[in-house]
Amino acid sequence: MIPWHCEQLNFISSLANNRPEFLDPLFLFLNYFDSPYFVMALVPFVWVGFSWRWGLRLFYLIAASVVVNTFFKELVGWPRPCADCPSVGMLCLKSFGFPSGGAQTCMLLGGLLIYTWKTRWAWIVGVSYIALISFSRLYLGVHYPIDVLGGWVLGLGLLWLYVRTIGPIEQFLHRQRLEACLGLSFVLPIALMLATTSPHYFRVDAVAIGIGAYLSLKWGLYLADNRDVRKGVVRGVLAVGLMWVGLVVVRGHLPTPWVYGVLALWLSLGVSPLVRKIVCS
């Protein structure tokens, strides 16, 4: 065991021994926010419900976060509490513990929400999301406090990088031909992801989402941006439902990476036109 994990393991053990059973289902549910299924719900909800541009930004931002997180996990190689002491973990994952991917993602997305909207409700939702997901990693016994802290630091770093670069990047892409943007959507994500053992489904997704966005723009399949919250929620919920229908249809028939690739194409080439037809009919 790593020396500075000893004291933290005492804290995790104490937390595990005093977990109220009625809270267990809540924190097990919160683990969903650190899974591909969360991305599969969030991106379509935003893409179809409100803005395909924001949906695309979120996808690439989360994909970049996964790559960075995987790189540091492999570089540092620290174990999880449940690996050091199996009795403390309600769950136990096989990957390394530092930094926490869940804490990193919630800091990135919660911070992005606060930065973008700058309202009281954005602060309430963003801070609550960060606090709940971060504490859930400790409650479930899958991370040490230092893992969560490391995730926060990386999440804030990625948010800072996004804020500083998104404008120039999108201005550059706007000046390029659509086909050039398609090529970049192939080369850059795959090059980054090949540098680590990041999940294979993100490599396939990155290519599929680029193809889908290209064809969607070329054929005019995307929905116009929407600022009506009620209308956006209806469109978003329909999109998530159609994505789950797609998952049920293809799961079991294809390898997992290809399942997510098909779903990425389904989002831009199938879900958006279907939702437009349903909402406008």
What is the predicted function of each stretch?
Residues 19, 61, 201:
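Charged, low-complexity surface patches
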